[in-house]
Amino acid sequence: LDQAPKGILIWRAILQWLGGIGIIVIALIILPFLRIGGMQLFHLEGDDPYDKFLPKISSVVSKIFIVYIALTLILFFLYYLNGMSLFDSLAHSFTTISTGGFSTHNNSFAYFNNITILNIAIIFMIIGSLPFLILAQSNFSNVTSIIKDHQIQLFLLILILAISLIYFFAKNYIDG
């Protein structure tokens, strides 16, 4: 990767970013029509429930897209302010928020040798894993309501348990 052309690397990052938002949009648009998932909240009563559905879903998708772009921009600036080049900041912000984890270097984040950059990546990968519908509806104005959401609580519980198990088994493996 260190020798790969920058055009290829940024293209790969852009595709990862578009895939991240694309899967969210597809889930919001397609699944309700198939009556799959918890998206029945968009179902409005009437003769044809989908007459009013598309304007509402368009509004929700727009909000989610704004949140996705805002998080990407915040991440870009945080990476840049903590020592990444403009190119690396852009590419890594695309791949972090989409949780793809692609890097522009052979050693991935170890290349930067910067714990702050690594912590930023961890935080934003967790944020990128959260339900964007909830993030868009809250506008990040009420963090308490986000944390009180049952999906997010379960996700964070599973995350904490997984990290604890990995730590326990890795520690036992290393210690012998």
Which residue stretches match the model-derived regions?
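Membrane-proximal intracellular helices of multi-pass ion channels
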Residues: 1-176
